[in-house]
């Protein structure tokens, strides 16, 4: 039978064909409605013209034509709305059919995966992956510790100097100026063996002096 009457159309093709027919019908209705609206404007203009001329019989006849024309316009609008509603329903059916086809494909893919997956083998692979990950994490931690031991003190000192310089720059000072204004230590840091160390100014005194200078700058 199909060879005599052609290939049987699929549901998707039938939906597309009906959708095209509905769209064509809506375009035809729009054109006819626009024609009637133009005719309505012409009738109104003729009614005004006849009324000015005092031809009331003609005015009454054309008024009836105007009422009929407006009713037709309203019917065309309602008809187009109904066709558009049907078109939307067809579009919904098409979307639902596409969703069903997609779900069907996903179901087949999931069934194939379930048949191919071998749980014991996957568990073994995951255990080996976790073990190798732990070894890599341990090696990375040891390497980071070694690098921190080699470079940590220097980095900390550089960061501290940078912070101090930034603070002094914001206050309009330099680190060399403040250090030169600090009290002298009065000798080297080391003391010879058997020699009594001389009294040194405490660090607290130096900090207090620096703090007092900063406070004076803020008041200025």
Curated annotation (Swiss-Prot):
Q: Where is the composition biased (Basic and acidic residues)?
A: 211-220
| A biological process from GO | late endosome to vacuole transport
User: What is the recorded membrane topology of this protein?
Assistant: Peripheral membrane protein
Which keywords describe this protein according to UniProt?
Coiled coil, Cytoplasm, Endosome, Membrane, Protein transport, Transport
User: Where does it primarily localize?
Assistant: membrane
What InterPro entries does the annotation carry?
Snf7_fam
Instruction: Provide an example Pfam family for this protein.
Output: Snf7
Q: Which family does it belong to?
A: Belongs to the SNF7 family.
Q: Which proteins does it associate with, and in what oligomeric form?
A: Probable core component of the endosomal sorting required for transport complex III (ESCRT-III). ESCRT-III components are thought to multimerize to form a flat lattice on the perimeter membrane of the endosome.
Q: Give the protein's biological function.
A: Probable core component of the endosomal sorting required for transport complex III (ESCRT-III) which is involved in multivesicular bodies (MVBs) formation and sorting of endosomal cargo proteins into MVBs. MVBs contain intraluminal vesicles (ILVs) that are generated by invagination and scission from the limiting membrane of the endosome and mostly are delivered to lysosomes enabling degradation of membrane proteins, such as stimulated growth factor receptors, lysosomal enzymes and lipids.
**Under what name is this protein listed?**
Charged multivesicular body protein 2a
Q: Which organism is it from?
A: Danio rerio
């Amino acid at each position: 039978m199909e060879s005599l009457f052609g290939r049987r159309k699929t549901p998707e093709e039938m939906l597309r064909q009906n959708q095209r027919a509905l769209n064509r019908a809506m375009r035809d209705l729009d054109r006819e409605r626009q024609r009637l609206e133009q005719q309505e404007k012409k009738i109104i203009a003729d009614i005004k013209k006849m009324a000015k001329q005092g031809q009331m019989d003609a005015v009454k006849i054309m008024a009836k034509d105007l009422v009929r024309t407006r009713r037709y316009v309203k019917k065309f609008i309602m008809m187009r709305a109904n066709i558009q509603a049907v078109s939307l329903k067809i579009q919904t059916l098409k979307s639902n059919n596409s969703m069903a086809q997609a779900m069907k494909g996903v179901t087949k893919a999931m069934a194939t995966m379930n048949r191919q997956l071998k749980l014991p083998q996957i568990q073994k692979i995951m255990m080996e992956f976790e073990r190798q990950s732990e070894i890599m994490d341990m090696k990375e931690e040891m390497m980071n510790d070694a690098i921190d031991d080699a470079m940590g003190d220097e980095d900390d000192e550089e960061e501290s100097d940078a912070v101090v310089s930034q603070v002094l720059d914001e206050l309009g000072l330099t680190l060399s100026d403040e250090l030169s204004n600090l009290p002298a230590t009065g000798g080297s840091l080391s003391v010879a063996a058997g020699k009594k160390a001389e009294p040194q100014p405490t660090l607290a005194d130096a900090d207090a002096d620096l703090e007092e200078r900063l406070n004076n700058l803020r008041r200025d």
